[in-house]
Amino acid sequence: MQPPAEALVYPEEQPVAPPARPRWRRPARWAVAVVSLLIAGGLAAYLIPILLAAHRAYGEVFVTPVPRPTVVINPQGTPELVLETPEPHEPTPTPLPSWDGTERINILLLGVDTTPERVAQGDPPRSDTMILVSIDPVTRQVGMLPIPRDLLVRIPGYGDDKINAAYAYGALSEFTGPGLVRATIEYNFGIPVHYFAEVDFQGFIRIVDTLGGVTVDVPAPIKDDEHPAEGFNYTRLYFPTGLQHMDGRTALRYVRTRHDDNDFARGARQQQVLEALREQAIQLELLARASELIDELGGTVRTDLRPRDVLALARLGVEIDKDDIHSYSLQGAVSDYWAPNGAFYLVANWPAVRQIVAEMTVSPQ
């Protein structure tokens, strides 16, 4: 079987104009904790006192420039990566002014597999979850688009492969995992990615457990007889229909499983848990748990959001209603393809994919 014609038709060989954004940096622990929750749906006014109190407790954030990759087209017409290397300078403190911008913000959420089994085998980290979040600060509209990990894309500088391979390639190179995933999405989807935030499996578990677990309404029974377990083993999962209160490890299994359905149902579960986490956080008195959460998340979350942007997004969260958080899917814009070697891919109809992206990123007038 040959892939559909559109499998080999990629976006026009033109680089996406890089958006204006700060250079990637490792944030202070308080910023990491707040960002991870903020992106899970916008926690409104609860975040503002946490931000200010944490800033007083941990001091100012020092910015150290690091390289980031951008896409260029070589004379052969194929995409390659180059590094924008900033001039070295002494770290300088970053203040926390109010944000007065009105431009749309696109944030890439990454769930990263750094399990001991991968480390023991010498394997690089892998992006297990990718969700593109687009926020319009004027209309207060939010769009969320899960990106299936089996999606066949052109990875700049590496050729055609599943999109979740981009993180591993980047992690083994100077481009970094988040940097190469961001460049891959910008090139294939034609959308700028202004920021990223990533959390590893342990960070996700800690977020859920620190919030006291999460309650999810399972729409249909889920059975998975081959869910990955510790020590290169498998375990059997079963989730009955109805309301289920899950601890962190159970919630992680719920969002990762896909043997009983497909990547699109898996993406829907990921969005469902993010929304449930948002509701759980809003119902709790977060100030009582802020320091606990900050300590728990140390080393498990990374982002290039600046503290000033975190504060601005926290203020914006006050005015975002849950009915204005919209979910999107690539289902219907991709088709199944089994390669001769037995590998499975999702092949995109790129005009249809870009139409979905346009619908998510163009707010009503």
What are these regions (language model features)?
Residues 2-365:
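Non-catalytic, solvent-exposed segments at the cell envelope interface
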